[in-house]
């Protein structure tokens, strides 16, 4: 810990003095609006808008009741350092902080206490604002807001309506030339009315009643309601997005079991943007790791969609008489020996696809057809009995369990056969839970000879295995009894009267098969995406209400803009109904549904007053975080979510930044396929509709590492307070004299290793805390917190203070005499190097170079002003309070916040010191010359040969050989 201020000289830089300096400058910055960024137009317009804009964004925090621990501010201090540096480079810097304030924790606290979540949320925000202000972050406080602010909710709902009132037209051209774009829903309705587009069932749109027309239109909307398989979590009482479910099929929050259920939910048609979301990753400056994660999540693949007729389906009462399957290997169609559909596939029928207990409603044959093998039936007396029982089992499994590659694959025969279009073969159709409804078409063709999973299933269920590929050098050499052949090769036994693939390699065979399928009207080439539509509703109270009402016919109506915002009603019980965590058959009950006076409402939506029912789901927490950076650009605008000119200034493309978006976005990699993907989707929709200047929200992304910590356990395995542990790795660690074990990981109250910024402010001051966090290592790497190591950063700042101020009197000790040549050269080199380090967010190495300069100044009898002032300016982005204080004491009236960052005005100072090169002739020293340490061998030889003693030794002849070892030696070999 820092030294006792009682024993320190009166003007020593202690935690107490640091606190006085820091709060003084924080108050002054706030009073003067030092960090305000000017807009080109509107309430926040000002002269700084003539400067180059630079928009720095942090992933904004959730206002937790626990406040911050020392791990949270790592990215914030880094972005503040960058913001301060860019201001000193002359930029108009937009840098602020809002709060992602809707969400489950505040609601759960409200459930426990009965206190409205808005109260605890606002209290938490106030505490976090206090902690961040005390840290000295240079935020433009005018631009701060919470996603729960009613004006912000207004525009979140407005953006939702833009998505709801749009459809994806694959023929439209986006403003950036991309194929396929969002268009107003009115254009779709016009195309339906004109007959240019027809409903999927081929009916006449104009002959449909109002409800049927609405159903057709809704099937195209980018925001729509779907009764589809979703992730139902009884323990939380809500549904979850795929991304909120862990790999082992449990909720990320609370670790409850998650089940697949068919439920009515709001969805966002993000899949329509799969190609653009994937392609445009090449236009942004993101870590390759994150781009790869998004590409894998989007999951682009190329293949073909093939139609298999199912002749017995209509007879059994099914609504379909064929199955479309997607395959990446259409060249293997001759080897398809069975098909598999997901338990939720509509061809099976049922009361609600995928639900259990609906045997009577299944559209399957009443008895097993001829040729059914015992292994196919699951021991059931009929297809309906077998499939009903199997679907009940599947409904109790999580998606992760069903998709587990290591699990033994199971299934039962449906009693239906599909007809392979290439050879007319009748192949049995199974239902199996490893096929997921929502991926592809929910149906697959199985080629067991060339797929390990299909091969295992075929062996288990006594199904045929037919070869269609083999190694080029021995097409029939692989033993299919031993396993599938999954390598490349050439096609074999793959011909009919119209197409012959035999002997073709994979790509040629695929192309030929797709061409044949298209010509015959049996299929077409297809690009598919693993990405699925975004589940966009929650059975929660503390979220944005949907600006949607439902009429008596079940038709959804968007509220007009003059009815926004829709505010949450006051309710007595904030909790959704939760269930036994393992109750897979339960159904969600949203808390808003209990507010009957709010739910049932009479409105005039243009055709007279009518009674409607409000949507009782709320939006997910992701809604507010999808667009907050745009609101930062124009937070007081009451006419628009953000003004066009202000958006273009801060987020539009410009020289050196071909795609738009924020100049720097810093946050954790854990958001790679959640927030970052959703925000890109909303941005593209708004871009297509002409509301924003570019299709990407974040141009440059930087993922910071994490501050982790050691925790200690005693002999009982109980955690002990980390700050009371003594010892080191050499001597071992003890607590109250007893040995303890050490483990490395996250900070947590239960681990008794939490350290808060408030503790650091009290013990060392904010600047010491900032310097320590930034000097712990490269910003993109995780690092362990060591409170005992903070003193090193304190000593650095204390030495800087002593280099300028007398610790006893507080008087300046700086001299106005010019610095010596050595000092001037070190200052110049430090300026050049620190500038490069700041530009690349290598703040730790910038600090190390500043320490070197400071140590050099400490060694001088008197510290020159022309050396310490550049040092203060260079350190100011990291330790702003101390540097402001020293700058002021050095006689400068204005804040250094916009003081020009030091530059090297005399480039000769960057020329390296010379070294002595020895020049020999036949191994004997003939001359010595001074050269730069970086001189090349070629230049060193030229300089050596020009020296008079060497010219004389050569006597006009060429040397036999010249041996050079730059920069210190040249040996010229001549005839003796």
Residue spans of the language-model regions?
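Basic, alpha-helical terminal appendages of large translation-related enzymes
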Residues: 1-49, 444, 464-475, 479-483, ...
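Residue patterns forming the tRNA-binding/recognition surfaces of aminoacyl-tRNA synthetases
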Residues: 2-11, 15-18, 23-24, 28-32, ...
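Conserved oxyanion/phosphate-binding beta-strand-loop segments in alpha/beta enzyme cores
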Residues: 6-57, 87-96, 120-126, 286, ...
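Long, charged, mostly alpha-helical binding arms that flank functional sites
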Residues: 12-16, 300-305, 470-473, 479-515, ...
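Amphipathic alpha-helical
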Residues: 26, 267-301, 346-412, 564-597, ...
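N-terminal catalytic cores of NTP/NDP-binding nucleotidyl/phosphoryl-transfer enzymes
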Residues: 40-121, 145-156, 325-328, 420-457, ...
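Catalytic alpha/beta core of large soluble enzyme barrels
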Residues: 79-80, 92, 349-472, 477-485
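Helix-rich, typically C-terminal accessory recognition domains appended to large enzymatic cores
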Residues: 100, 171-178, 219, 224-231, ...
